[in-house]
A protein has these predicted regions:
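Short helix-initiation/N-cap motifs at beta->coil->alpha
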Residues: 44-48, 97-107, 227-236
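His/Asp/Glu-enriched short active-site or ligand-binding loop at hydrolase and phosphoryl-transfer sites
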Residues: 84, 208-231, 251, 280-281
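N-terminal hydrophobic or amphipathic helices and topogenic motifs
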Residues: 11-59
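Bacterial N-terminal signal peptides
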Residues: 1-9
Length: 316
């Protein structure tokens, strides 16, 4: 738990030297009874840590592209004062000060005087989180494993940042689109699909990953559906046995499978996907980032798997 005290009644003479710390501390309470009249709000993150906010934060650092996309989508871009070097959507996010990614720069974060740091669990180091706690900088950790987690995070951030109306509206729109896509594909066959997350070694997605859930929602059968991990390794014997009818490669400037590695799959001539030329590409940003555009990724998966259900076809 990050316990930060809101100090009241500071003498006017100390206002200057206390200003940076006060900006971080403003709105963060301990929930003590004598402060109950401020009606603090409690938020529990995906590490089961609690933070208490009396008002919406006004200086936020985002440590993930997906989180940055959520903040822009719900109208909190003005409060966003720091991002990672991979926060590139929407384009104006590139103009925000950078604080690192897998190894965030603590000094850069401190210089921005944030009153909230939003971070993904994936790359978060315990020592880094401990340093934030020592500095009394509140951090809220997000770890989306399902589409519902993504929607829940959007609504939680909306409540936290005073953007409930826009966040709830966004989540409702996303749920409606998901329902529409499921309805289109519900009665259709479920072709076998391999999603190549990494080539060497061959890594795909399994139960426990939201990309697996996207494949299922789109009407496909993930050949790694029996895997015991969210991102299992496969050998070619397993792939040949499952015989995928579709092979999908993520592509992008940062994450993705290079064209040369995609072409290597042509050698496996007994695979149904190779025989029929059913190789497809999908933007890694749409499916690897658990943010608002995940529904766009779902629709592309659905168009790949069931082109007959859509007027606009996606060509291999």
């Amino acid at each position: 738990m990050v316990a930060i005290f809101l100090i009241a009644g500071l003498a006017q003479a100390h206002e200057g030297e206390q200003a940076p710390m006060k900006r971080r501390q403003q709105g963060i309470l301990t929930g003590m009874p004598f402060m109950a009249n401020l009606a603090p709000r409690t938020f529990v993150d995906d590490l089961d840590r609690k933070i208490y906010l009396a008002k919406a934060p006004i200086r936020i650092v985002s440590l993930a592209p997906s989180i940055t996309e959520v903040l822009y989508a719900i109208g909190s871009s003005e409060e966003l004062v720091g991002v990672t070097q991979y926060c590139d959507y929407p384009p104006e996010a590139r103009l925000k000060p950078k604080v690192g990614y897998t190894h965030p720069n603590l000094e850069s974060i401190m210089a921005l005087q944030p009153d909230l740091v939003l971070a993904p669990r994936e790359f978060l180091r315990a020592d880094f989180l401990g340093k934030l706690e020592q500095l009394k900088i509140p951090a809220f950790i997000l770890d989306a494993k399902t589409i519902e987690d993504v929607l829940s995070h959007i609504q939680t951030l909306g409540r936290m940042l005073g953007r409930s109306a826009s966040a709830d509206g966004l989540a409702a729109q996303m749920r409606q689109r998901i329902t529409e896509i499921k309805t289109r594909t519900a009665t259709l066959p479920h072709p076998r699909l391999l999603y190549v997350l990494n080539s060497e070694p061959l890594i795909t997605v399994g139960p426990g990953s939201f990309i697996h859930q996207l494949i299922v929602l789109a009407g496909g059968t993930n050949i790694a559906r029996r895997a015991r991990s969210a991102y299992p390794r496969l050998n070619m014997e397993e792939v040949l046995k499952e015989d995928p009818e579709l092979i999908v490669f993520p592509v992008g400037l940062v994450e993705g499978i290079p064209e040369s590695e995609q072409q290597v799959w042509q050698r496996w001539t007994t695979l149904s996907a190779v025989k029929r030329g059913r190789f497809f590409r999908i933007s890694s940003d749409l499916v690897n980032r658990p943010g608002p555009r995940i529904v766009e990724g779902l629709e592309i998966f659905a168009r790949i798997i069931h082109p007959e259900a859509f007027e606009d076809k996606i060509k291999p």
